[in-house]
């Protein structure tokens, strides 16, 4: 029931039910948010104790890279199957068992150090992560407070950076990655059981409405009963409304240079992000010689949290000043940010001083994240209006397949080969890959010139047709 409907309720019985409903939804939201934050903390745990993990599992850098990539494979498979499973099974119990599986993948390290068993559980860790990752925003859209859904959605976006920082800092101070994973598992478990005992109606896709009739003694509307809309009928109506978009497929849009270049540019950006975040703890210890808890925790917190957040805000603000991402100048602005990011990428491997390294890495993430909202906006602007929603899905899928998935492994292969002769080689390659991003954005700027001409011609044709109709 929406907040607007709730405001119409005047009976004491109805108000009591609404208060209970609001508290229940608030508790579920808090539980989901904390769980989502903890689910995003595993990357920080691994990064904080990379040397210990390699020693206990008896693996080299190459295998440690695969150890990171296998989680991304699990997430891809999970993403392809999660919506089917959520529609086939009861959502509350599916989320419950997915979180139990997630906790099991965190605790497996206490029982075995066999690399192949661990890799199987790492795959399941990525697979189980997807269920709350996909369902949480959906739940907010359906059951969130009407006037606060935007704020609630914004909180969801903060879970990933805050979770990563929490996992890194907690594990750094605990001193053992197994304790870091155990902390995540034993915090998720009670929250999982709280969700299990919440009423089913707050997880079901069925939509509830309050039936109101004017029979109160003072003429006001009162709540008498609760009825629910049949789920099958709702699905049929939804299917009737949804029609396939006319025109070319979203996949064919990748053949258009203006769209392909911007998607690949964001993919390159995600590749550098993922490789740096996954291996930064290893770089602290083995290259910079920073084993101090406070130094590592402070640098990771500043770089992973403050840099991306302030960069995204600054990039969006500057883009608005030049007319927004619909203007061709936004590609030129993005190219400028990419060059500044590339300069930082060149300087970082040359630095041995921890303070200078922190500043350079902060600026790298700051300027790189200045591009992120602009790149997403440009990708929307480069496709037909009917394909804008699908464009983000394709964009994200390409970023996962070509960015997040290979990044840890590629870094590991390079580091395993050159760490004895040049321990900075892998980080230098990972960071300076950003120059490919600069080339792609410059090409996008070139191709958008033709796009603007086409749009102008279409607009002139439409205006001419309108004038003819008026006559």
Q: How should each PLM-predicted stretch be described?
A:
Residues 179-197, 425-444:
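Symmetry-related core transmembrane helices of the 12-TM Major Facilitator Superfamily/SLC fold
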Residues 93-107, 329-346:
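Structural signature of the two symmetry-related core transmembrane helices
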Residues 121-160:
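Cytoplasmic helix-loop-helix junction between adjacent transmembrane helices
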Residues 77-115:
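Conserved MFS/SLC helix-loop-helix module at the cytosolic interface between two early adjacent transmembrane helices
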Residues 156-204:
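Helix-loop-helix hairpin linking two adjacent transmembrane segments in secondary transporters
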Residues 46-47, 256-313, 369-372, 376, ...:
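Extracytoplasmic gate region of multi-pass secondary transporters
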Residues 27-61, 276-281:
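Extracytoplasmic
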Residues 148-175, 304-312, 396-408:
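Glycine-rich segments within core transmembrane alpha-helices of 12-TM secondary carriers
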């Amino acid at each position: 029931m929406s907040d607007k409907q709730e405001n119409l309720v005047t009976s004491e019985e109805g108000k009591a039910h609404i208060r209970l409903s609001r508290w229940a939804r608030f508790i579920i939201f808090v539980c989901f948010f904390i769980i989502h934050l903890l689910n995003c903390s595993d990357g920080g745990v691994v990064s904080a104790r990379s040397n210990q993990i390699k020693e206990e599992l008896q693996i080299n850098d190459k295998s440690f890279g695969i150890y990171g990539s296998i989680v991304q494979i699990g997430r891809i498979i999970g993403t392809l199957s999660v919506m089917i499973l959520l529609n086939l099974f009861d959502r509350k119990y599916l989320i419950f068992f997915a979180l139990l599986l997630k906790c099991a993948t965190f605790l497996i390290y206490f029982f075995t150090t066999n690399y192949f068993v661990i890799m199987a559980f790492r795959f399941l860790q990525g697979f189980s992560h997807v269920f709350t990752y996909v369902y949480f925003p959906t739940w907010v859209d359906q059951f969130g407070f009407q006037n606060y859904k935007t704020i609630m959605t914004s909180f969801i976006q903060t879970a990933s950076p805050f979770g990563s920082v929490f996992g890194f800092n907690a594990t750094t101070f605990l001193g053992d990655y197994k304790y870091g994973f155990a902390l995540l598992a034993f915090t998720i478990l009670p929250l999982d059981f709280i969700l299990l005992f919440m009423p089913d109606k707050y997880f079901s896709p069925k939509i509830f409405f309050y039936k109101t009739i004017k029979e109160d003694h003072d003429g006001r509307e009162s709540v008498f009963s609760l009825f629910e809309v049949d789920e099958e009928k709702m699905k049929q109506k939804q299917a009737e409304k949804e029609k396939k978009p006319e025109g070319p497929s979203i996949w064919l849009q990748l053949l258009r240079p203006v769209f392909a270049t911007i998607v690949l540019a964001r993919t390159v950006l995600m590749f550098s992000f993922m490789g740096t975040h996954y291996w930064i703890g290893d770089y602290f210890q083995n290259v910079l010689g920073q084993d101090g808890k406070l130094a590592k925790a402070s640098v990771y917190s500043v770089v992973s949290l403050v840099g991306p957040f302030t960069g995204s805000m600054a990039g969006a603000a500057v883009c608005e000043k030049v007319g927004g991402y619909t203007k061709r100048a936004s590609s030129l602005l993005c190219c400028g940010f990419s060059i500044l990011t590339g300069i930082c990428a060149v300087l970082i491997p040359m630095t041995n001083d921890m303070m200078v390294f922190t500043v350079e890495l902060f600026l790298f993430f700051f300027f790189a994240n200045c591009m992120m909202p602009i790149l997403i906006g440009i990708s929307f602007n480069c496709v037909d209006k009917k394909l804008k929603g699908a464009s983000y899905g394709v964009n994200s899928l390409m970023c996962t397949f070509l960015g997040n998935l290979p990044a840890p492994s590629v870094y590991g292969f390079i580091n395993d080969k050159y760490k004895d002769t040049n321990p900075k080689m892998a980080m230098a390659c990972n960071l300076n890959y950003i120059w490919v991003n600069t080339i792609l954005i410059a090409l996008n700027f070139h191709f958008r010139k033709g796009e603007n001409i086409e749009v102008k011609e279409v607009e002139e044709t439409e205006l001419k047709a309108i004038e003819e109709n008026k006559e």
